């Protein structure tokens, strides 16, 4: 699970949600294939596989095969999430902390976009 209460300060003083770099990861990127590279490589592969399964799930005619494909797709999404969480916990991913006005602006913008959708609003 991602701990969104963890914060770090960037070298330029910006507060971010995230963790500091793990000592497991090399300080500088180098030509060696390390833990970070392996996890990022697997994460990218999972993203491509998920896209293929998503397309396939929309085009399957047999209900039984559809059920298998969608179950596999669900499991792949969980695996991708776990990989992302692992990279987050190693300090590979961080996000800026948004102030309430920034959150309000984003919510307002997407609420306005929502009314443009051709789907019924709930």
Task: Please provide the spans of the model-predicted regions.
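Amphipathic alpha-helical hairpins
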Residues: 1-122
């Amino acid at each position: 699970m991602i701990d969104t209460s963890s914060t770090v300060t960037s070298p330029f003083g910006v507060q971010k949600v995230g963790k500091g770099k793990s000592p497991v990861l090399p300080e500088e990127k180098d030509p060696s294939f390390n833990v970070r590279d392996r996890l990022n490589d697997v994460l990218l592969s999972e993203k491509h596989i998920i896209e293929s399964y998503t397309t396939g799930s929309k085009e399957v005619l047999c209900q039984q095969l559809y059920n298998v494909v969608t179950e596999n797709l669900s499991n792949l999404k969980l695996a991708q999430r776990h990989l992302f969480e692992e990279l987050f916990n190693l300090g590979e991913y961080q996000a800026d902390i948004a102030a309430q006005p920034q959150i309000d602006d984003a919510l307002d913008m997407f609420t306005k976009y929502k009314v443009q959708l051709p789907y019924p609003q709930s």
